[in-house]
A protein has these predicted regions:
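Membrane metalloprotein/metal-transporter helix-bundle signature
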Residues: 2-190
Length: 190
Protein backbone atom coordinates (compact mmCIF):
# COMPACT_ATOMS: atom_id res chain seq x y z
CA UNK A 1 0.00 0.00 0.00
CA UNK A 2 2.76 2.43 0.98
CA UNK A 3 4.74 1.56 -2.17
CA UNK A 4 1.69 2.25 -4.34
CA UNK A 5 1.05 5.56 -2.58
CA UNK A 6 4.72 6.58 -2.94
CA UNK A 7 4.71 5.64 -6.62
CA UNK A 8 1.50 7.64 -7.21
CA UNK A 9 2.90 10.66 -5.38
CA UNK A 10 6.13 10.51 -7.40
CA UNK A 11 4.20 10.17 -10.66
CA UNK A 12 1.96 13.13 -9.80
CA UNK A 13 5.00 15.23 -8.90
CA UNK A 14 6.68 14.46 -12.21
CA UNK A 15 3.50 15.11 -14.18
CA UNK A 16 2.72 18.42 -12.50
CA UNK A 17 3.09 21.53 -14.58
CA UNK A 18 3.79 25.03 -13.28
CA UNK A 19 0.84 26.95 -11.89
CA UNK A 20 -0.14 30.23 -13.47
CA UNK A 21 -2.03 32.74 -11.37
CA UNK A 22 -3.52 34.58 -14.34
CA UNK A 23 -4.81 33.51 -17.74
CA UNK A 24 -2.71 34.35 -20.78
CA UNK A 25 -4.65 36.89 -22.86
CA UNK A 26 -3.19 35.55 -26.09
CA UNK A 27 -4.53 32.08 -25.32
CA UNK A 28 -7.77 32.83 -23.48
CA UNK A 29 -8.60 36.33 -24.71
CA UNK A 30 -8.39 39.64 -22.95
CA UNK A 31 -11.93 39.51 -21.51
CA UNK A 32 -11.36 36.16 -19.78
CA UNK A 33 -7.94 37.29 -18.56
CA UNK A 34 -9.62 40.35 -17.06
CA UNK A 35 -12.39 38.32 -15.44
CA UNK A 36 -9.92 35.87 -13.92
CA UNK A 37 -7.44 38.48 -12.72
CA UNK A 38 -9.19 39.67 -9.51
CA UNK A 39 -10.22 36.11 -8.66
CA UNK A 40 -6.62 34.97 -8.14
CA UNK A 41 -5.37 37.64 -5.74
CA UNK A 42 -6.20 37.31 -2.07
CA UNK A 43 -5.86 41.06 -1.60
CA UNK A 44 -8.42 41.76 -4.31
CA UNK A 45 -10.86 39.11 -3.11
CA UNK A 46 -10.69 40.24 0.52
CA UNK A 47 -11.19 43.91 -0.38
CA UNK A 48 -14.02 43.33 -2.88
CA UNK A 49 -15.99 41.03 -0.59
CA UNK A 50 -15.43 43.42 2.34
CA UNK A 51 -16.93 46.26 0.27
CA UNK A 52 -20.07 44.18 -0.21
CA UNK A 53 -20.28 43.17 3.45
CA UNK A 54 -19.82 46.77 4.57
CA UNK A 55 -22.51 47.93 2.14
CA UNK A 56 -24.87 45.32 3.60
CA UNK A 57 -24.12 46.57 7.12
CA UNK A 58 -24.99 50.13 6.10
CA UNK A 59 -28.07 49.02 4.17
CA UNK A 60 -30.49 51.02 2.05
CA UNK A 61 -28.98 52.82 -0.92
CA UNK A 62 -25.51 51.70 0.18
CA UNK A 63 -26.31 48.19 -1.05
CA UNK A 64 -25.80 49.37 -4.62
CA UNK A 65 -24.16 52.80 -4.27
CA UNK A 66 -21.05 51.70 -2.37
CA UNK A 67 -20.15 48.83 -4.73
CA UNK A 68 -21.01 51.03 -7.74
CA UNK A 69 -18.64 53.73 -6.46
CA UNK A 70 -15.89 51.14 -6.15
CA UNK A 71 -16.40 49.81 -9.68
CA UNK A 72 -16.58 53.34 -11.13
CA UNK A 73 -13.43 54.59 -9.43
CA UNK A 74 -11.66 51.35 -10.23
CA UNK A 75 -12.33 52.09 -13.90
CA UNK A 76 -10.88 55.58 -13.40
CA UNK A 77 -7.74 54.15 -11.79
CA UNK A 78 -7.39 51.67 -14.64
CA UNK A 79 -7.72 54.48 -17.16
CA UNK A 80 -5.04 56.50 -15.39
CA UNK A 81 -2.62 53.56 -15.51
CA UNK A 82 -3.33 52.85 -19.18
CA UNK A 83 -2.77 56.56 -19.94
CA UNK A 84 0.61 56.36 -18.20
CA UNK A 85 -0.34 58.48 -15.18
CA UNK A 86 1.61 57.28 -12.16
CA UNK A 87 0.09 56.99 -8.70
CA UNK A 88 2.37 56.75 -5.68
CA UNK A 89 2.17 53.91 -3.18
CA UNK A 90 -0.21 51.71 -5.21
CA UNK A 91 0.67 48.41 -3.52
CA UNK A 92 0.72 49.84 0.03
CA UNK A 93 -2.64 51.52 -0.67
CA UNK A 94 -4.11 48.20 -1.80
CA UNK A 95 -2.88 46.54 1.36
CA UNK A 96 -4.26 49.45 3.41
CA UNK A 97 -7.61 48.97 1.67
CA UNK A 98 -7.81 45.33 2.76
CA UNK A 99 -7.02 46.17 6.37
CA UNK A 100 -9.07 49.38 6.35
CA UNK A 101 -12.16 47.77 4.87
CA UNK A 102 -11.80 44.88 7.29
CA UNK A 103 -11.69 47.34 10.18
CA UNK A 104 -14.76 49.18 8.87
CA UNK A 105 -16.67 45.88 8.76
CA UNK A 106 -15.29 44.68 12.12
CA UNK A 107 -16.32 47.93 13.80
CA UNK A 108 -19.62 48.05 11.87
CA UNK A 109 -18.94 51.71 11.00
CA UNK A 110 -22.04 53.45 9.65
CA UNK A 111 -21.06 56.47 7.59
CA UNK A 112 -23.45 58.34 5.31
CA UNK A 113 -23.72 56.65 1.91
CA UNK A 114 -21.78 59.43 0.13
CA UNK A 115 -18.92 59.23 2.63
CA UNK A 116 -18.85 55.43 2.38
CA UNK A 117 -18.76 55.68 -1.40
CA UNK A 118 -15.88 58.17 -1.17
CA UNK A 119 -13.89 55.86 1.11
CA UNK A 120 -14.25 52.84 -1.15
CA UNK A 121 -13.74 55.03 -4.21
CA UNK A 122 -10.35 56.14 -2.95
CA UNK A 123 -9.30 52.55 -2.35
CA UNK A 124 -10.69 51.52 -5.74
CA UNK A 125 -8.56 54.08 -7.55
CA UNK A 126 -5.45 52.17 -6.46
CA UNK A 127 -6.93 48.74 -7.24
CA UNK A 128 -7.81 49.91 -10.75
CA UNK A 129 -4.38 51.43 -11.26
CA UNK A 130 -2.76 48.14 -10.26
CA UNK A 131 -4.89 46.26 -12.79
CA UNK A 132 -3.93 48.76 -15.49
CA UNK A 133 -0.29 48.34 -14.62
CA UNK A 134 -0.60 44.56 -15.01
CA UNK A 135 -2.21 44.75 -18.44
CA UNK A 136 0.61 43.07 -20.34
CA UNK A 137 -0.44 41.80 -23.77
CA UNK A 138 -4.16 42.07 -23.05
CA UNK A 139 -6.40 44.48 -24.92
CA UNK A 140 -7.19 47.30 -22.49
CA UNK A 141 -10.93 47.59 -23.15
CA UNK A 142 -11.69 43.88 -22.95
CA UNK A 143 -9.38 43.31 -19.98
CA UNK A 144 -10.86 46.29 -18.14
CA UNK A 145 -14.40 45.15 -18.80
CA UNK A 146 -13.49 41.67 -17.57
CA UNK A 147 -12.04 42.77 -14.26
CA UNK A 148 -14.91 45.20 -13.68
CA UNK A 149 -17.38 42.33 -14.17
CA UNK A 150 -15.43 40.11 -11.75
CA UNK A 151 -15.18 42.94 -9.22
CA UNK A 152 -18.93 43.57 -9.36
CA UNK A 153 -19.52 39.84 -8.89
CA UNK A 154 -17.24 39.79 -5.82
CA UNK A 155 -19.11 42.81 -4.45
CA UNK A 156 -22.39 40.98 -5.05
CA UNK A 157 -21.03 37.96 -3.20
CA UNK A 158 -20.03 40.23 -0.32
CA UNK A 159 -23.48 41.84 -0.18
CA UNK A 160 -25.15 38.41 -0.25
CA UNK A 161 -22.79 37.12 2.42
CA UNK A 162 -23.37 40.20 4.57
CA UNK A 163 -27.14 39.96 4.26
CA UNK A 164 -27.04 36.21 4.86
CA UNK A 165 -24.97 36.33 8.03
CA UNK A 166 -27.15 39.12 9.42
CA UNK A 167 -29.67 36.41 10.21
CA UNK A 168 -27.10 34.87 12.53
CA UNK A 169 -26.53 38.17 14.30
CA UNK A 170 -24.41 41.27 13.66
CA UNK A 171 -21.38 39.74 15.36
CA UNK A 172 -20.85 37.30 12.49
CA UNK A 173 -20.25 40.06 9.94
CA UNK A 174 -17.93 41.75 12.40
CA UNK A 175 -15.96 38.52 12.77
CA UNK A 176 -15.67 38.38 8.96
CA UNK A 177 -14.27 41.91 9.09
CA UNK A 178 -11.72 40.83 11.67
CA UNK A 179 -10.81 37.86 9.47
CA UNK A 180 -10.26 40.31 6.61
CA UNK A 181 -7.90 42.35 8.80
CA UNK A 182 -5.99 39.19 9.71
CA UNK A 183 -5.84 38.22 6.02
CA UNK A 184 -4.50 41.66 5.14
CA UNK A 185 -1.88 41.42 7.87
CA UNK A 186 -0.87 37.97 6.64
CA UNK A 187 -0.41 39.37 3.13
CA UNK A 188 1.66 42.23 4.54
CA UNK A 189 4.05 39.89 6.30
CA UNK A 190 4.29 37.26 3.57
Amino acid sequence: MLKRLSFTAALMTLAASPAFAHLDPETHGSLMAGISHPLFGADHILAMVAVGIWASQIGGRALWAVPAAFVTMMAVGFGLAVAGVELPFVEPAILASVIGLGLLVAAAVRLPVAASAAVVGLFALFHGHAHGGELGAAGALQFGLGFLIATAALHGAGVALGLGVTRLGPAVARILGLATVVGGAAIAFS
